[in-house]
C-alpha cells in the first residue's frame, strides 16, 4: 500500500502529528478506494507478487496524545502517526485483513448508488454476504474503523450514517433545508430526535435565545427537566445522548458551540467514574472513535453531581462502587487527560468507595432538579 507522507496528518510540533480523517465528497472517497485496490492489484501483478500488509493508524492509547488548548479553550485527544500492520499471511490478522476489503467493497457500492446506511444496516448486509467473516456488530465496527484508518476519511464520507440516540429540547429553533422550523420547546417531554445525517445537521439553521446549553447524561433526567419546562426558568437548551455520546450527538453539540460560541456548555452526570468518562468524551473525544476522535471536542464544564453535593444526598442513597467503576477510574487516571480538579473528584470517589446518582436529589422533591441547576449557575459552581 503506497502512502503519501502528507496525507491527513497535521504537524503541531517537530515530533508530534495529528492523524485525522478527511471529510470527502462521494467521488473523492470512491477515488481513495480505487487507489487502494489498484495498489493491491499492481503488487499482485508484479514479477515478484506478494500480498501487501495493510498499514493502519494504531488506535491504541500508546499512540494517543493530548492537545491542550492554547489559542482556544478546547483540548482534545488525537491519534499520532504510529502504524499497525494487518496481514493476510498472519493467522491472527488474516480475517481482519479480508474484512477491510469486504467493507470497502460495500462502501464503494453505497457511494455509487448515492445511498447512506447505518452501521447496523451494514452489519446485516455483511452478515448476509460474508457470514464467515462477520458474525457480530463489533467486528463490523472495528472493520469500519480500520477502513477509516486506511483511507483517512470519515465514516460519513464512506456513506455510513451515524446512529443517533440524541435528543434536544428547550429554547432552540431548528430548520432543515426546505422544511418548516421546529420549536424544540414545543416537542413535549420526549424532545426532538437528533438525526444521524451529519450533512443535514451541518445545513440546519439554528436560532436560540438561550444563555446555556446543558447536557444531561440520563434520558429519565432529561425527561423530568423538559416535562417541568425548566428551560422557561433557566434560558437553556437541554441535550441528552442517553449515556455515552454517539457521533451525531457530538456533531450536533459541536455545531451549536460554533454557531453560539458565547453559550457555556454545562454537563450534568452521575457522581461516578462512568459519569466523568461521559463528560470527558464530550470534552476531549475518545480513542475508540479513531481518527475522528478529536473533531467534535467541546469546552464543556462540569456542573454536577460533584463531591460537594454529597451533603445534599442522604447517606443511604450512596451506592458502593462497582468493579467496572474501579476499572474506569483507573483508566481515566492513567490517561493524563484530566485537569487537577477532575482528578480530585475522581480520587474522592475512589477513596470513599461510593457513587451517587442524580435521582438521589429527588429526596428534596421531584421539582428540585431545576432549583439545583439554577443555584449552581448563579453561584458559578461549574468546573
UniProtKB/Swiss-Prot annotation:
It holds the Pfam family TOP6A-Spo11_Toprim. It is found in: Nucleus. Residues 24-167 form the Topo IIA-type catalytic domain. Its main location: nucleus. CDD domains: TOPRIM_TopoIIB_SPO. Keywords: DNA-binding, Isomerase, Magnesium, Meiosis, Metal-binding, Nucleus, Topoisomerase. GO terms for molecular function: ATP binding; DNA binding; DNA topoisomerase type II (double strand cut, ATP-hydrolyzing) activity; metal ion binding. Disruption phenotype: Plants show a semi-sterile phenotype and a drastic decrease of meiotic recombination, indicating that SPO11-1 and SPO11-3 are not functionally redundant. SPO11-1 and SPO11-2 are both required for double-strand breaks induction. Drastic decrease in chiasma formation at metaphase I associated with an absence of synapsis in prophase, due to the inability to make double-strand breaks (DSB). The keyword Cytoplasm does not apply. It is an enzyme of class 5 (isomerase). Its EC number is 5.6.2.2. Its cofactor is Mg(2+). Mg(2+) binds at residues 217, 270. One of its GO terms (biological process) is meiotic cell cycle. Very low expression in flowers and shoots. GO terms for cellular component: chromosome; nucleus. The active site is at residue 124. The keyword ATP-binding does not apply. It catalyses: ATP-dependent breakage, passage and rejoining of double-stranded DNA. Heterotetramer of 2 SPO11 (SPO11-1 and/or SPO11-2) and 2 MTOPVIB chains. Interacts with MTOPVIB. May form a heterodimer with SPO11-1. Interacts with PRD1. Does not interact with TOP6B. Component of a topoisomerase 6 complex specifically required for meiotic recombination. Together with MTOPVIB, mediates DNA cleavage that forms the double-strand breaks (DSB) that initiate meiotic recombination. The complex promotes relaxation of negative and positive supercoiled DNA and DNA decatenation through cleavage and ligation cycles. Belongs to the TOP6A family. This is Meiotic recombination protein SPO11-2. The gene is SPO11-2.
Amino acid at each position: 500500500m503506497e502512502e503519501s507522507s502528507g496525507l491527513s496528518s497535521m504537524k503541531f510540533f517537530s515530533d508530534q502529528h495529528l492523524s485525522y480523517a478527511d471529510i470527502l465528497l462521494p467521488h473523492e472517497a470512491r477515488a481513495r478506494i480505487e487507489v487502494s485496490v489498484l495498489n493491491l492489484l499492481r503488487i499482485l501483478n508484479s514479477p515478484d507478487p506478494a500480498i501487501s500488509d495493510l498499514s493502519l493508524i494504531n488506535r491504541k492509547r500508546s499512540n494517543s496524545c493530548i492537545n491542550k488548548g492554547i489559542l482556544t479553550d478546547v483540548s482534545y485527544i488525537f491519534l499520532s502517526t504510529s502504524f499497525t500492520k494487518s496481514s493476510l499471511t498472519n493467522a491472527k490478522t488474516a480475517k481482519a485483513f479480508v474484512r477491510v476489503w469486504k467493507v470497502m467493497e460495500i462502501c464503494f457500492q453505497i457511494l455509487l448508488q448515492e445511498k447512506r446506511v447505518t452501521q447496523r444496516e451494514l452489519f446485516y448486509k455483511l452478515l448476509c454476504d460474508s457470514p464467515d467473516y462477520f458474525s457480530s456488530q463489533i467486528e463490523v465496527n472495528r472493520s469500519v474503523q480500520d477502513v477509516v484508518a486506511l483511507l483517512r476519511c470519515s465514516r460519513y464520507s464512506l456513506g455510513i450514517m451515524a446512529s443517533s440516540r440524541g435528543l434536544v429540547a428547550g429554547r432552540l429553533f431548528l430548520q432543515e433545508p426546505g422544511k418548516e422550523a421546529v420549536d424544540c420547546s414545543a416537542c413535549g417531554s420526549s424532545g426532538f430526535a437528533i438525526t444521524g445525517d451529519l450533512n443535514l445537521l451541518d445545513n440546519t439553521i439554528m436560532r436560540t435565545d438561550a444563555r446555556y446549553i446543558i447536557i444531561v447524561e440520563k434520558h429519565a433526567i432529561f425527561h423530568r427537566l423538559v416535562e417541568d419546562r425548566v428551560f422557561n426558568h433557566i434560558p437553556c437548551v437541554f441535550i441528552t445522548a442517553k449515556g455515552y455520546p454517539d457521533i451525531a450527538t457530538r456533531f450536533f453539540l459541536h455545531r451549536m458551540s460554533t454557531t453560539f460560541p458565547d453559550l457555556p456548555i454545562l454537563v450534568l452526570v452521575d457522581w461516578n467514574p462512568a459519569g466523568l468518562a461521559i463528560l470527558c468524551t464530550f470534552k476531549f473525544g475518545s480513542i475508540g472513535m479513531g481518527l475522528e476522535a478529536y473533531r467534535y471536542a467541546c469546552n464543556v464544564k462540569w456542573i454536577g453531581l460533584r463531591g460537594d453535593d454529597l451533603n445534599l444526598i442522604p447517606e443511604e442513597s450512596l451506592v458502593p462502587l462497582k468493579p467496572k467503576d474501579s476499572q474506569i477510574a483507573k483508566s481515566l487516571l492513567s490517561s493524563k487527560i484530566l485537569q487537577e480538579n477532575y482528578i480530585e473528584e475522581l480520587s474522592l470517589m475512589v477513596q470513599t468507595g461510593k457513587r451517587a446518582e442524580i435521582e438521589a436529589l429527588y429526596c428534596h422533591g421531584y421539582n428540585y432538579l431545576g432549583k439545583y441547576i439554577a443555584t449552581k449557575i448563579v453561584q458559578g459552581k461549574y468546573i
